[in-house]
Amino acid sequence: MFTLKKSLLLLFFLGTISLSLCQREADDDQGEVQQEVKRGFLSTVKNLATNVAGTVIDTIKCKVTGGCRK
């Protein structure tokens, strides 16, 4: 009976460690996903700002030179 208790205790201990490691890894994966989403969002904002700035510069250049085509 004592041997059975030791075996069950060992299995419980190993299962607890395994579960803890899986939970920690899942938390790390969620952090990586959030970083990728932030990176994608910032990239979109940067591209939008670049396009708007280019359009504004073209409009100003057109008005200054007076050579606008419509």
From Swiss-Prot:
One of its GO terms (biological process) is defense response to Gram-negative bacterium. Keywords: Amphibian defense peptide, Antibiotic, Antimicrobial, Cleavage on pair of basic residues, Disulfide bond, Secreted, Signal. Disulfide bonds join 62-68. Antimicrobial peptide. One of its GO terms (cellular component) is extracellular region. Residues 1-20 form the signal peptide. Residues 21-39 form a propeptide. This is Ranatuerin-2Pa. It comes from Lithobates pipiens (Northern leopard frog). It comes from the Eukaryota.
